[in-house]
Amino acid sequence: MVLVHVGYLVLPVFGSVRNRGAPFQRSQHPHATSCRHFHLGPPQPQQLAPDFPLAHPVQSQPGLSAHMAPAHQHSGTLHQSLTPLPTLQFQDVTGPSFLPQALHQQYLLQQQLLEAQHRRLVSHPRRNQDRVSVHPHRLHPSFDFGHQLQTPQPRYLAEGTDWDLSVDAGLSPAQFQVRPIPQHYQHYLATPRMHHFPRNSSSTQMVVHEIRNYPYPQLHFLALQGLNPSRHTSAVRESYEELLQLEDRLGNVTRGAVQNTIERFTFPHKYKKRRPQDSKGKKDEGEESDTDEKCTICLSMLEDGEDVRRLPCMHLFHQLCVDQWLAMSKKCPICRVDIETQLGADS
């Protein structure tokens, strides 16, 4: 057994060591995996030095067996002194199986974190495609445990939102291309109808849950569509049409009085103009006197012999004018007293 000093770590190496005076050299094996192999010995293509077994803990790689077989056939004496070894930078290397217990537990913790991150990315394939293309090195394991342990992502990133893609990837807003709007959102833009919007809490929660996974630029586009004045004008027009249809279904609600009620509670007669006394003097023709009366509905002066109607409140109107008014409302146009209420109070 040889103790290899790697930075501040002391790693045991089992097996024979050839060319003990040769420097510690690193070479990369052309496997499809991200593992790197370390050889002890001079850089000779014919000789094979013992390698670290870098296969994954569960499955074995057949490409490593042929490469590792000659390493176990060498035997020799272990020497007590070793030449100083340069400090190696371990990056993207999985932990060997012969690590001490503390490092082995740390290695297992890293594997669990990587598996959890992989499951989270697989559960959201849309985010997985974008992120793997931009950061392909995130899924590679690393031997530098102190820097590889990643902090948990915020909740809004773990739930599948996509508006952090341009920031994560370092892209400018011009480079971040907006994807086409899905078909199930087209009807919100094509036909601005008020009945398309949800009116209860359950449907609102469903729409909010779907829009939460919606990209930010397209949400901005939806907000701009909501600021279009034509949409609000159309909504107001349709709301007024709905009120007209409701009025047709309910019918005309009449709050006026029928003709029999009008005749019963009012006093119709022929108007006779009051004459002023001669002692007070005569006024010029065309000038109104204090005794002249006016119909406040048509704003015309009352003339002698016209058909008038006096209400219980003693206000006087033209008969035709006040009959049309009382057919819509039973209250006096001036004092707003109901003709039936006034009669009942006096009696």
From Swiss-Prot:
ZnF RING-type: positions: 295-336
Pfam families: zf-RING_2
Phenotype on disruption: Around 10% of mice die at birth. While surviving pups are the same size as their littermates at birth, they fail to thrive and grow, reaching only 50% of the size of their siblings at postnatal day 15. They die before weaning during the first 3 postnatal weeks. Null pups display relaxed forepaws and reduced dorsiflexion. Hind limb defects are also observed. Defects are caused by inefficient growth of motor axons to distant muscles.
Region called Disordered, residue ranges: 23-79, 268-289
Gene3D superfamilies: Zinc/RING finger domain, C3HC4 (zinc finger)
Binding residue positions for Zn(2+): C295, C298, H318, C321
Keyword Acyltransferase: no
Domain notes: The RING-type zinc finger mediates the E3 ubiquitin-protein ligase activity and binds directly to free ubiquitin. Non-covalent ubiquitin-binding stabilizes the ubiquitin-conjugating enzyme E2 (donor ubiquitin) in the 'closed' conformation and stimulates ubiquitin transfer.
Protein family (similarity comment): Belongs to the Arkadia family.
PANTHER family per record: E3 UBIQUITIN-PROTEIN LIGASE ARK2C, E3 UBIQUITIN-PROTEIN LIGASE RNF165
Protein name as annotated: E3 ubiquitin-protein ligase ARK2C
